[in-house]
């Protein structure tokens, strides 16, 4: 999580995440890229737009199934940020993101944060993390990041409570990344629409 990523979600609210028509009509999305001819339903937009934090970061279109990110920038982003340059790598990455342990990282880090001083010991003694020292270490690192940034997040008005921080974190992290990458990989031709939809459903369930 980054403080300013969460702030952007908080600032634009559902307009940033969903870009729903009623928000657009009231001018909430004036600084965001939207397709005014989009005819997607509320249900479809709710499913497609979980990854819009990432889409907005790269100047994409928020209320479409595709990301709308410039092709050259999308290619560069996939290669440099995610080491995805073909179908096999795309499938491997998306499978990892859509199944444990990847999607558990924020959950464990956040739960450990709520446990205060006992958080790190709780992670190290977790049966679910016992088979992966790498994942356990990642959760500990992210827990410490939440601790460092919590006051700044509260002072900036990004979250009003620990509960709200937890909700924003899922969107900014696990579910958002899976949604975003599946849409980008579909546009890139690495996966087809049916495969993309499987990933979007998995992200939505997170």
Spell out what each predicted region is.
Residues 2-180, 184-197, 202-206:
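Polar/charged low-complexity regulatory segments
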């Amino acid at each position: 999580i980054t403080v300013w990523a969460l702030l952007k979600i908080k600032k634009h609210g559902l307009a940033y995440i969903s870009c729903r028509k009623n928000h657009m009509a009231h001018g909430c999305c004036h600084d965001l890229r939207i397709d005014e001819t989009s005819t997607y339903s509320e249900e479809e937009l709710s499913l497609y737009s979980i990854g819009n934090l990432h889409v907005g970061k790269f100047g994409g279109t928020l209320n479409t199934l595709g990301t709308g990110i410039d092709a050259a920038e999308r290619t560069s982003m996939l290669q440099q940020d995610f080491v995805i340059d073909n179908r096999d790598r795309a499938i491997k990455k998306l499978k990892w993101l859509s199944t444990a342990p990847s999607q558990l990282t924020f959950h464990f880090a956040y739960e450990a944060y709520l446990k205060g001083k006992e958080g790190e010991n709780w992670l190290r003694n977790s049966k679910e993390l016992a088979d992966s020292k790498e994942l356990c270490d990642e959760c500990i690192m992210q827990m410490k990041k939440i601790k460092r940034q919590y006051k700044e997040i509260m002072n900036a008005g990004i979250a009003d409570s620990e509960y709200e921080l937890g909700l924003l974190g899922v969107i900014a992290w696990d579910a958002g990344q899976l949604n975003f990458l599946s849409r980008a990989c579909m546009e890139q031709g690495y996966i087809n629409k049916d495969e993309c939809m499987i990933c979007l459903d998995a992200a939505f369930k997170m």
